[in-house]
Amino acid sequence: MNIVEQMKQKLKEEIKEAVIRSGVATEADVPSVILETPKDKAHGDYSTNVAMQLARVAKKAPRMIAEDIVRHFNGEAVFVKKVDIAGPGFINFYMDNRYLTELVPAILQAGDAYGETNVGQGQKVQVEFVSANPTGSLHLGHARGAAVGDSLCNILKKAGFDVTREYYINDAGNQIANLAKSVEARYFQALGIKKDMPEDGYFGEDIIELGKKLAEEHGDKFVALDEQERLQLFREYGLAFEMDKIKKDLADFRVTFDVWYSETSLYHNGKIDKALETLREKGHIYEQDGATWFRSTTFGDDKDRVLIKQDGTYTYLLPDIAYHQDKLERGFEKIINIWGADHHGYIPRMKAAIAALGYDPDVLEVEIIQLVSLYQNGEKVRMSKRTGKAVTLRDLMEEVGLDATRYFFAMRSSDTHLDFDMDLAVSQSNENPVYYAQYAHARVCSMLRQGEEQGWRYDGDLSFTYELAEKEIDLLKKLGEFPSAVAEAAVKRSPHRMTNYIFDLASALHSFYNAEKVLDAANVEKSRARLALMKAVQITLKNALALVGVHAPEKM
């Protein structure tokens, strides 16, 4: 708990004690005290409606209760310099903001650790995200999912969760069979042998490139192989080729994974048979019309689901059930799946499966990533200028830059459609939120360098003996909110709350800079204190930007 949270907690405790001392209510009847931050500063730094909450118990008008509480409130004990009552009984508290200066040395001491909280209490959480089919380049939906997923993992870890990042490789099923046939056709064509592409094949330049590469490296030695042996070989070549590309794109996007989990492994290690047997033993499987069905309606699904088709092949659902059973058996207390917008209808059947396996369905959380539209020059961008094909993650990174791509994908709630303005993303103006935030960091670093050139040290015995300016107080308060912002973004699974915080902190810094002088040769002690404040801003901004995968430049 940081200094601001400690102060708020002490204020809540003093309000509760004042209620008890006033005789308005006994300790057992005092509700949980809630502190709000008034939108209008004229109404104080904090406000509570506890008097209105107590009206029924005390059988008195809320305003009279508020007056009783205020009479018995000890403000000096909790840095309160003034209290007043507003409206029907709101109690407003005006803080003596000297306590805020204690934040600065605390942030300087914490450094990279500033913002860490223990709201997660070590809970084991698995976050599965991206999980794109290994049959082509990552598109914009995958890119947004990657940015949101990685940012969420960073935030959860900062908030005290034990996080595992996982990518599920869809390396079984028809799409991989079609990939193998596509590689085979391009290989034959590269050798000058006529071979038609499969009807549902993959026609991208990457498969043509792989076919040529195989022909150059191996000649025609695969032509004489048995077809099944050849297709198995091309399956492996194609899968490795596509996964290498995906891994490189994600690494360049600053997205990492702890586990790359192969769907095929579920078949080889008997986990699919195990999941099917578990459901059968629990009475949730039946046979009908030559197919094997999961009685998912028992658990709230709108209809029962086929697991094994009449021809003996599995539907997508069965390996997915086996995969989630494996997740749960690995001891994860919370499973967070980040899925594309087209998977929304899949959630009830997956929760039904988890319940049928004997687990709490609420262990599964699904965050839906809505679609992305690109705009340039006011027009919707449908194709990449470079390739003439659909825009990929790689295209976007090269067009607008890595930092802008990461920030823009994280700055809106993932369950809302995102209009990505490419012109805004590259503009060097205050309207560009990532430029605005990075410029704030660079501006602070510039001030720190200037202070260093003057030989003004800001560590050790800091002294904020002067009266704090209004914008300085605002900036200190915003610094103090960082751990709470991390905790809220983690608990609500909302990385966009962190970009909101970054924008607010950058705004507070720019406002302070425009209103106040940081470096003043006529007042070295004040300059030292404000340089320490700037260092605290630099640490906090850097830590916050890192959570959403964005670089904090020292110069711009």
From Swiss-Prot:
PROSITE patterns, A to Z: AA_TRNA_LIGASE_I (PS00178)
- Top EC class of this enzyme: ligase
Q: Which NCBIfam families match?
A: argS
Q: Which HAMAP family match?
A: Arg_tRNA_synth
The record's family statement is: Belongs to the class-I aminoacyl-tRNA synthetase family.
Xref: PANTHER family: ARGININE--TRNA LIGASE, CYTOPLASMIC, ARGINYL-TRNA SYNTHETASE
| The protein's name in its UniProt record | Arginine--tRNA ligase
Q: Which gene encodes it?
A: argS
